[in-house]
Amino acid sequence: MKKSHLVYLSFVFLLTSCLPFAPTEPIQVANPGEILYQESFADNTSGWDRVLNDGGIMDYDSGGYRILVRGADMNFWSTPPGNFGDVRVEADVTKLNGPDENRAGLMCRYQNGNYYFFIVSNDGFYAIGKFTGGQAILIGQESMVQTEFIEADGVNHLRADCIGNTLTLYVNFNQVASTLDA
């Protein structure tokens, strides 16, 4: 029997400056602390990926964004329309069913398949890393680290700050990690 993983997301992006590399599309600019992009998922044409295949589903659902992963060792993600630089990204994530050993999280600086990621699992672990050249690499840690701040059976409010080369993860309004990527 295949196990299912469901996650609902609600996003808020805050801009604090600009990317250090040349993007393929213009960077959206705002003053520090201003909301640059906010998504309620009420409009199913707002630009997020809609996928239905044997591996899973990504789609708008009841005012949220649902990600269902049907197989082990699979990753599904979607990014908002636009190009953002230094950001604060926030989302509420909920596991609806499936095992507690799972992953949900946030990304920043997605460019040509490369990005930073901030992940948590319902069994209480987190990690910060980057995906580059087809490889996932954890930054500042050798493996996922346990924290008491993750709610196994509830909503987890995640926040990721990508400011310059500093990457910071918050879980339920508590900073759990901060690291530098040189």
Model-identified regions with their sequence ranges:
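C-terminal motif of bacterial Sec signal peptides marking the signal peptidase cleavage site
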Residues: 15-17
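Bacterial signal peptide processing site
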Residues: 19-21
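Extracellular carbohydrate-recognition regions
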Residues: 25-52
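Extracellular glycan-recognition surfaces and repeat-rich motifs
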Residues: 43-73
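Secretory/extracellular carbohydrate-interaction modules
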Residues: 69-133
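Short, aromatic/His-centered strand-loop micro-motif at the edge of beta-sheets
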Residues: 134-157
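Localized edge beta-strand/strand-to-loop motifs within extracellular or lumenal beta-rich domains
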Residues: 154-168
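Short, solvent-exposed beta-strand-to-loop segments that form ligand-recognition rims
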Residues: 170-182
